[in-house]
Regions:
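Short substrate-entry loop that stabilizes the transition state in hydrolases
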Residues: 5-66, 147-148, 170-173
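C-terminal catalytic histidine-bearing segment of alpha/beta-hydrolase fold enzymes
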Residues: 190-236
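Alpha/beta-hydrolase active-site loop
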Residues: 38-42, 67, 74-102
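Short glycine-enriched nucleophile-adjacent loop
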Residues: 118-130
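Alpha/beta-hydrolase fold nucleophile elbow
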Residues: 103-115
Length: 236
């Protein structure tokens, strides 16, 4: 299950003007056909490896399909789509829905989140704690790890977490995330942290802007190897 970041799930070319999300209304530019390159790429990646990818739209369903720009965390308009108390409920609803689908193995459902969605994923893992009926694991890309983003600065989760960070992230602090991970591991959680030298925020965005940085390109290629290894490596 995929959790988009603060920009929302749609292409930046259309999302700024989106007030409506619809599959059937031609005036709605934001729909499954206008996902960002990153979300489309990862959805196809999981399909190619035999997994179903579900991408809930936390923002469009609440009239905020346009998403939010950089450094807007304190914007009051984000309160009702926040990553601590609102978006984890979206993840819980998605888990319940996936388990109702006959073609889905309900014991092998995983989380992948980016930035704000990565923070959401960490909060989901904190909320479910030692529960055996929750998500099996989480792949977390460059999350915000400060107190404003996380429910706790020590995450207690029995499910494994893989955290992928860029050393040159210009939006969030990789050092803060490493500190959170270190405390969490000391408390018994299973968190693997990878910091990519020279990589920035959004290092896995396949667009030319991000991939023109060789460090981002190398990070993306490594992340795609690690992602399937982390998930396939879990025992049923």
């Amino acid at each position: 299950m995929l959790l988009h970041g603060r920009g929302g799930p749609y292409s930046i070319n259309v999302n700024r003007g989106c007030t409506l999300v619809s599959r059937t209304n031609p005036s709605a530019a934001c729909n499954a056909g206008s996902l960002s390159k990153r979300h489309a790429m990862w959805g196809q990646y999981w399909a190619d490896h035999g997994y179903v990818a579900l991408l809930p739209d936390s923002f469009g369903s609440r009239g905020k399909a346009h998403g939010f720009g950089r450094f807007t965390h304190d914007d009051p308009d984000r309160t009702d789509v926040n990553e601590k108390t609102v978006r984890p409920l979206d993840a819980a609803g998605a888990l319940s829905w996936l388990r109702s689908q006959k073609e889905i193995n309900g014991d092998r459902i995983f989380l992948q989140g980016w930035s704000n969605g990565g923070s959401t994923a960490l909060n989901v893992m904190q909320r479910q704690g030692a529960a055996t009926s929750g998500y099996r694991a989480a792949l977390v890309f460059y999350p915000g790890c400060g107190p404003a983003a996380l429910l706790a600065q020590t995450i207690k989760s029995d499910a494994p977490i893989t955290m992928l960070l860029g050393s040159d992230d210009e939006e969030v602090s990789p050092d803060r995330c490493r500190d959170v991970a270190s405390r969490s591991v000391a408390a018994g959680s299973k968190i693997d942290v990878v910091v990519y030298p020279g990589a920035t925020h959004d290092f896995d965005d396949p667009g030319r802007g991000r991939q023109s940085n060789p460090a981002n390109s190398a990070a993306l290629q490594d992340a795609m190897v690690r992602a399937i290894a982390a998930i396939d490596g879990l025992k049923d």
